[in-house]
Amino acid sequence: MDAIKKKMQMLKLDKENAIDRAEQAEADKKQAEDRCKQLEEEQQALQKKLKGTEDEVEKYSESVKEAQEKLEQAEKKATDAEADVASLNRRIQLVEEELDRAQERLATALQKLEEAEKAADESERGMKVIENRAMKDEEKMELQEMQLKEAKHIAEDSDRKYEEVARKLVILEGELERSEERAEVAESKCGDLEEELKIVTNNLKSLEAQADKYSTKEDKYEEEIKLLEEKLKEAETRAEFAERSVAKLEKTIDDLEDEVYAQKMKYKAISEELDNALNDITSL
């Protein structure tokens, strides 16, 4: 952008130089008019003083005529130079307007890109929170599985104890009363284990429901992240388009600089011709 602004300043400086040269051309034109008037006065004086020298008077008349023709040519060239300056002013104005529009589009694209990056960062933080929660849920599930395995082991041990009691009931009828008490204790433990098993089963079902819920949320966040990625790609595309527009503007300004240089050379040639014409008039 700094390079573009410098180029625009150079164009404005060239425009001011062209205006100064046009004003100088006007001054040269006025000087030529004064010189022409002076020649006319000298011609009149010579006509009064040298009535007999018609050849010299005719020579001075031709010189005045040539001076008038050169003056007309100088006026035409000065007019053309002024028209070129006006055209250059219009082109510079168009380039400045186009540059302003490109800067606005680029600023908008950069703002949208920044917003998309912020949204992506927020989504990433949300995903990390979900992952942490999922890890905690997995740890809870592992703990519940361990509790379930422990409950199964306890149940198996209870079954083995119950079978052992039954065998002892067959073998030891004399200890029937004691065996019945042990059986009641075992049955009570089995009931407690069954209740614990039911609780563990319910906890597992609750964990499965929570896992399904988190899975649904994860799918939703994935869709949101995908949408944000699409928006980010769109913002990047717009930014690339803005950069291409700026490059195009830079090329346009380079072309204008070439054209300004050509106009300067043209104006220089005009100035040289005008100087030559004034020198010719002065030499007369």
UniProtKB/Swiss-Prot annotation:
GO molecular function: actin binding; actin filament binding; identical protein binding; protein heterodimerization activity; protein homodimerization activity; structural constituent of muscle
Entry keyword set: Acetylation, Actin-binding, Coiled coil, Cytoplasm, Cytoskeleton, Disease variant, Muscle protein, Nemaline myopathy, Phosphoprotein
Coarse class of the protein's main subcellular location: cytoplasm
Compartments where located: Cytoplasm, Cytoskeleton
Effect recorded for D2V: In CMYO23; likely pathogenic
Modified residues (Phosphothreonine): T53, T79, T108, T252, T282
Record-listed Phosphoserine modification sites: S61, S87, S158, S206, S215, S271, S283
Keyword presence, Glycoprotein: no
Ranges for region Disordered: 1-65, 117-136
UniProt modification remark: Phosphorylated on Ser-61 by PIK3CG. Phosphorylation on Ser-61 is required for ADRB2 internalization.
Effect of Q103R: In DA2B4; uncertain significance
One of the GO BP terms on file: muscle contraction
Family annotation (InterPro entries): Tropomyosin
Modified residues (N-acetylmethionine): M1
Modified residues annotated as Phosphotyrosine in this record: Y261
Tissues where the protein occurs: Present in primary breast cancer tissue, absent from normal breast tissue.
The protein's role, per its UniProt record: Binds to actin filaments in muscle and non-muscle cells. Plays a central role, in association with the troponin complex, in the calcium dependent regulation of vertebrate striated muscle contraction. Smooth muscle contraction is regulated by interaction with caldesmon. In non-muscle cells is implicated in stabilizing cytoskeleton actin filaments. The non-muscle isoform may have a role in agonist-mediated receptor internalization.
Complex formation: Homodimer. Heterodimer of an alpha (TPM1, TPM3 or TPM4) and a beta (TPM2) chain.
Domain comment as written in the entry: The molecule is in a coiled coil structure that is formed by 2 polypeptide chains. The sequence exhibits a prominent seven-residues periodicity.
Family matches, as PANTHER family: TROPOMYOSIN
Protein's recorded name: Tropomyosin beta chain
Gene name per UniProt: TPM2
